């Protein structure tokens, strides 16, 4: 760890000490001023510098064992389980999201990996909705999409719960089981060498065949690591090939306006023998 109020100079000193003559950096993720300062420091020290975002992103796709361990540890902390104990009638989306984020901090998270999505009843049909002062009522469903960041690495998980059985429980439980089956098929399809498009299609066909195709409007998943969204993509329009050691999300969903939505999301390691879920939380339908 370098501690300095002149990190460009400290970086140059480090590179010189190990006799580095040329470096490649990724422009994305840097403030323009930081990027310019690094370039100027390298030029003045005669260290060659080049920018190649694509190659650096590609190097990051397959994760090393230590990276996988950090991400797995991030996923399997108990913030969600502890938050469920706080669920009660009339709690707001905002209050429950705050409790979940507090529990993630208590569980060792440095910060949230992204803005927590926590929604009730018909608002669960918004794939990326933000918490409001909407109050929870008996019979509502609850969608939680959250993750923590620790040591720079992100986690991403979604679960949908039911707070009792409301008037729409029969239809929503049917939707839940379709999403659960699509989630299972998506994970089963994954292995090194498959394309993101093929993986997406394996889950999407389950949803289409049950008559909900038009209500699944996003890709099946994405890579996760130092960024919450990184390569590769599991998408109907992108043909990237999955390689071993990659970590991706599998997150099918069905979202029906004015009724509600269901999404189930796990993070999955790609291996030559198949996709291996990193989560230890169940995907069974749970009525609280």
Task: Please tell me what each predicted stretch does.
Residues 1-288:
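Active-site neighborhoods and metal-handling regions in enzymes and metal-associated proteins
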């Amino acid at each position: 760890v370098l501690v300095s109020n002149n990190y460009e100079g400290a970086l140059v000193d480090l590179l010189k000490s190990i006799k580095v003559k040329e470096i490649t950096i990724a422009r994305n993720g840097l403030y323009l001023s930081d990027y310019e300062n690094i370039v100027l420091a390298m030029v003045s020290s005669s260290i060659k510098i080049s920018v190649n975002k694509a190659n650096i992103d590609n190097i990051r796709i397959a994760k090393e064992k230590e990276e996988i361990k950090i991400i797995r540890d991030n996923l399997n902390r108990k913030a969600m389980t502890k938050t469920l104990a706080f669920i009660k009638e009339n709690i707001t989306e905002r209050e429950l999201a705050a409790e979940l984020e507090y529990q993630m901090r208590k569980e060792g998270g440095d910060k949230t990996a992204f803005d927590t999505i926590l929604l009730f009843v018909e608002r669960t049909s918004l794939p990326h909705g933000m918490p409001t002062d909407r109050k929870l009522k008996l019979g509502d469903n609850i969608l939680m999409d959250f993750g923590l960041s620790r040591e720079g690495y992100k986690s991403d998980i979604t679960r949908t719960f039911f707070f009792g059985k409301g008037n729409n429980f029969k239809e929503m439980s049917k939707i839940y089981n379709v999403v659960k089956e699509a989630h299972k098929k998506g994970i089963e399809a994954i292995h090194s060498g498959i394309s993101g498009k093929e993986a997406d299609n394996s889950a999407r066909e389950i949803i289409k065949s049950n008559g909900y195709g038009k209500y699944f409007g996003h890709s099946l998943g994405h890579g996760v690591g130092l960024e919450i969204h990184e390569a590769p993509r599991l998408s109907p329009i992108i043909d990237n090939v999955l390689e071993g050691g990659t970590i991706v999300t599998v997150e099918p969903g069905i979202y029906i306006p004015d009724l509600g939505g269901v999404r189930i999301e796990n993070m999955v390691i790609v291996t030559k023998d198949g996709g291996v879920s990193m989560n230890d939380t169940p995907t069974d339908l749970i009525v609280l």
